[in-house]
Amino acid sequence: MGNCCGTAGSLAQNDNKPKKGRKKQNPFSIDYGLHHGGGDGGGRPLKLIVLNDPTGREIESKYTLGRELGRGEFGVTYLCTDKETDDVFACKSILKKKLRTAVDIEDVRREVEIMRHMPEHPNVVTLKETYEDEHAVHLVMELCEGGELFDRIVARGHYTERAAAAVTKTIMEVVQVCHKHGVMHRDLKPENFLFGNKKETAPLKAIDFGLSVFFKPGERFNEIVGSPYYMAPEVLKRNYGPEVDIWSAGVILYILLCGVPPFWAETEQGVAQAIIRSVLDFRRDPWPKVSENAKDLIRKMLDPDQKRRLTAQQVLDHPWLQNAKTAPNVSLGETVRARLKQFTVMNKLKKRALRVIAEHLSDEEASGIREGFQIMDTSQRGKINIDELKIGLQKLGHAIPQDDLQILMDAGDIDRDGYLDCDEFIAISVHLRKMGNDEHLKKAFAFFDQNNNGYIEIEELREALSDELGTSEEVVDAIIRDVDTDKDGRISYEEFVTMMKTGTDWRKASRQYSRERFNSISLKLMQDASLQVNGDTR
């Protein structure tokens, strides 16, 4: 969805090559002209009216807004208390200045319309009232205090196939009621489900209908929306219907059982190609421990042929869900829980920043790491391979699964020679040991912020990564898109610190990302052989 206003300069016509000292147009800072440049003929800007029939105009006449509960791309969710009854709710305040396009505005209108249209359901959050003032649209909703789906799974020490079956059954019941009432959700993902309260028996509730649409039987859609890892192949092909919700639920089920998405890559084009190919991998841990019934259901939910894909009712009728209470109750292992907690793949900016921090480590900080490297380097070559890394980490008390070890190796192996040299190992150690204190991070940020204005801008990022292997415009754009959470087209120190401390998490993917980038990527894929569907290792 929408981006921030203003541009950062422009390129001369027919000159597409970035040059030193010359600003390239900032593709992440776009002026859509909805908030200025228009008017009533007298120089006064037109007022933006979003809702057709809000409950009222002044939310504070009835409610007291309290602490912040969450923050998204378009606004903030607050704790909200009814002044008369003291009942508590959640208030989702959507800032009008963030609604940059007609599509953004229509999404908000439709979200309200759909939530009003949906029947009361124990697993769908209830919309109580709506307000609209000059600055924001306020949606007063049922309060869900139990936290996110994945967070609760991680908090439990014991995670099983039976628990995954119970969650999947709930999600599919939500999909079923949506489809029964002519609503296609289009953005099913774990973050859009919250537990109603903190009790163990709390209901799981769908909370976000911002990308949902009404549909009629047989109606086809072509707009690319959703979150990249959960998109069905037919969305990328621009010809889809409600079957996309079954696919997204299948992706969630896959993640619930193994901790990572089935279709993953480091760039958005790679993600799109993986989705189109639809190759499932049931060989790595913990899949050998997962029942055949569960794997059979995943195959049928993630069938690339939408005509063969199961309906919501057929999923609920599948033996694995029919017998959810008797599904295996054996722990799927700490690996899955750890992956759900954070599946981190470092982007090139983070890799470079880790090397800068490594270069600034004191002798005392670095010496212990170097000693560890020398112990691992049994062949005395000055570099270690993945086997030496595994043995060395085991000696140091780190038992890392083979798949995650390969991810770590790939992240650290900057020159792609299949080995880690001492400097690469130090950078990885900084990441593993969370050694990036404030002083280290400030030095690393200053390395990129060449003009000392407090931001890493596109040109500075491009220049800093110019000597990195595989750094294309697409990679630079993807870094900005991932790290620049306020969408002003540059990376602040706070955004940089967040990236360094949490990594690039596949769970966080904005609507902006999918709408603007996947539109062009789908066109590109339509023109090459990427649309051919291959077999899988199921």
Curated annotation (Swiss-Prot):
Q: Which residues bind Ca(2+) 3?
A: 449, 451, 453, 455, 460
Classification via PROSITE patterns: EF_HAND_1, EF_HAND_2, PROTEIN_KINASE_ATP, PROTEIN_KINASE_DOM, PROTEIN_KINASE_ST
This protein's membrane topology, according to the annotation, is: Lipid-anchor
Residues binding Ca(2+) 1 are: 377, 379, 383, 388
Residues where Ca(2+) 4 binds: 484, 486, 488, 490, 495
Q: Which residues form the Protein kinase domain?
A: 63-321
Query: Per the record, what is one GO cellular component?
Result: nucleus
Superkingdom is Eukaryota
Q: Give the record's GO biological process terms.
A: abscisic acid-activated signaling pathway; response to salt stress
- Lipid addition (N-myristoyl glycine) is recorded at 2
Task: Report residue spans for region: Disordered.
Answer: 1-37
Q: Which CDD domains match?
A: EFh, STKc_CAMK
Q: Explain the induction of this protein.
A: Induced by touch, wounding, and darkness exposure. Also induced by high-salt treatment.
Matching SUPFAM superfamilies: EF-hand, Protein kinase-like (PK-like)
Task: Recount the known activity regulation.
Answer: Activated by calcium. Autophosphorylation may play an important role in the regulation of the kinase activity.
The tissues where this chain's protein is expressed are given as: Expressed in embryos and most of the vegetative tissues.
Principal localisation: nucleus
Q: Which residues carry this modification: Phosphoserine?
A: 227, 492
Enzyme Commission number(s) from the entry: 2.7.11.1
Q: Which UniProt keywords apply?
A: ATP-binding, Calcium, Kinase, Lipoprotein, Membrane, Metal-binding, Myristate, Nucleotide-binding, Nucleus, Phosphoprotein, Repeat, Serine/threonine-protein kinase, Transferase
The record lists ATP as bound by 69-77, 92
A Pfam family assignment? EF-hand_7
Please describe the quaternary structure of this protein: Interacts with ABF4. Interacts with CNGC18.
Task of the protein: May play a role in signal transduction pathways that involve calcium as a second messenger. Involved in maintaining Ca2+ homeostasis in pollen tube tips by regulating CNGC18. Functions as regulator of the calcium-mediated abscisic acid (ABA) signaling pathway. Phosphorylates ABA-responsive transcription factor ABF4 in vitro.
Query: Domain notes, please?
Result: There are 3 contiguous domains conserved in the CDPK subfamily: a kinase domain, an autoinhibitory (junction) domain and a calmodulin-like domain. The autoinhibitory domain (327-357) inactivates kinase activity under calcium-free conditions.
Can you say what this protein is called?
Answer: Calcium-dependent protein kinase 32
